[in-house]
Swiss-Prot record:
It is an enzyme of class 2 (transferase). This is Ribosomal RNA large subunit methyltransferase I. PROSITE patterns: PUA. Residues 2-81 form the PUA domain. GO terms for cellular component: cytoplasm. InterPro entries: PUA, PUA-like_sf, PUA_sf, RLMI, RlmI-like_PUA, SAM-dep_methyl-trfase, SAM-dependent_MTases_sf. GO terms for molecular function: RNA binding; rRNA (cytosine) methyltransferase activity. Specifically methylates the cytosine at position 1962 (m5C1962) of 23S rRNA. The gene is rlmI. CDD domains: AdoMet_MTases, PUA_RlmI, RlmI_M_like. It comes from Erwinia tasmaniensis (strain DSM 17950 / CFBP 7177 / CIP 109463 / NCPPB 4357 / Et1/99).
């Protein structure tokens, strides 16, 4: 008999709207014993069945919903169905945008909570972020073998969020060959090198694909400052948009070395590309004091906020760094600025930019809005899936 999670009275409303999470405060009791990650049935306070979910006793998210169908088994065939459904969207995107790399599974928005899978050519890079995902590891890998027999599988479940689920960090070859130190991929006509084994996340920020392409529209003849550049995707795009020059700034020399290789790989003029290892906050202040000016600044910082307690501090950080950027722009210059913090709402981010403009004694015109690329879909019942937001601002 399947273990049942009984909700507290009145706490079923979010599940009736198909939100896939059950928080600890919504749980009245667990009827039976379940191992971490094991599949359980979620019921309302009267015992009415609501969903099939994975049990996670160590997390504030006590259960993540696998299925809304009572008779659906969570097995290899289940994962095959989910993978095939997700692939339909990616096939269309790959054909439309001439892609060989994309996010194959975007967690909850593809009906597989706690699971991220990125495809880079014939390498599938796996991140299992929840107890349920880890519990189903063998079934998922078998399903991947069935759906993608020609692909190698590499595990990058080396992220700290696993600790909240009571899980150890894991990394390494799961199936097939190990990825090369740098794997070439294509994106909107660009060739880019990806470090699957030691790079950020799964190796590359696929979610910024559309924003990188948009850079070409703003780069023509401009002097560009590319902040938090990582491996230079925005720099390559700016050069392809015929910028005057681009300075890429990052704290990682290894990332900057790959950025230079990416410029060379695309046959672009390396003399127009400069790579600087530095702290962006300190460099912006130094540039301001030295009177440096730019025509386009790209601001793509790492996540500033991990939980609600950090939100106020993150607001100050975003305001400060964007104020400094605005002070460095020539009149009519463009600022492309982003936040990848899910807790930072789009309207709040826009207000922060408006406040930054006041402090910079400038005005901004919001020209264009950005979001994560379409291979990172957001399902209607899970608005938390919308985490990346950005604006193109004309600073006057």
């Amino acid at each position: 008999m399947t273990v049942r999670l009984i909700l507290a009275k009145g706490r079923e409303k979010s599940l009736l709207r198909r939100h896939p999470w059950v928080f600890s405060g919504a749980v009245a009791r667990l009827e039976g014993k379940a191992q971490p990650g094991e599949t359980i049935d979620v019921c309302d306070s009267q015992g009415k069945w609501l969903a099939r979910a994975a049990w996670s006793p160590s997390s504030q998210i006590r259960a993540r919903v696998w299925s809304w169908q009572q008779d659906e088994s969570i097995d290899i065939d289940f994962f095959v169905r989910r993978l095939n459904a997700a692939q339909q969207l990616r096939d269309w995107l790959a054909l439309r945008d001439n892609l060989d790399s994309y996010r194959l599974i975007a967690g909850e928005s593809d009906g597989l909570p706690g699971i991220t899978i990125d495809r880079f050519g014939n390498f599938l890079v796996l991140q299992l972020l929840s107890a349920g995902a880890e519990y189903q590891r063998a079934a998922l890998i078998t399903a991947l073998q069935r759906c993608y027999p020609d692909c190698a599988i590499y595990d990058r479940s080396d992220v700290s969020v696993r600790k909240k689920e009571g899980l150890e960090l894991t990394q390494g070859v799961v199936l097939g060959d190990a990825p090369p130190p740098l794997l070439p991929i294509t994106e909107h006509g660009m060739k880019l090198l990806v470090d699957i084994q030691t790079g950020h996340k799964t190796g590359y920020y696929l979610d910024q694909r559309d924003s990188r392409q948009a850079t070409r529209r703003y780069a023509q003849g401009r002097r560009v400052l590319n902040c938090f550049s990582y491996t230079g995707g925005f720099a390559v795009s700016a050069l392809m948009g015929n910028c005057k020059e681009v300075i890429s700034v990052d704290t990682s020399q290894a990332a900057l070395d790959v950025a230079r290789q990416n410029v060379e790989l695309n046959g672009l003029d390396v003399s127009k590309a400069h790579f600087q290892r530095d702290d962006v906050f300190k460099l912006l202040r130094r540039y301001r004091d030295e009177g440096e000016k730019f025509d386009l600044i790209i601001m793509d910082p790492p996540k500033f906020v991990e939980n609600k307690n950090q939100l106020m501090g993150a607001c100050r950080g975003y305001k400060d760094i964007n104020m400094l950027a605005m002070q460095l722009l020539n009149p009519g210059g463009m600022l492309m600025t982003f936040s990848c913090s899910g807790l930072m709402a789009t309207d709040l981010f826009q207000k922060i930019l408006a406040d930054a403009a006041v402090d910079a004694q400038r005005e901004v015109q919001f020209i264009e809005q950005f979001r994560q690329a379409a291979d990172h879909p957001v399902i209607s019942s899970y608005p938390e899936g919308m985490y990346l937001k950005g604006f193109a601002c004309r600073v006057i």
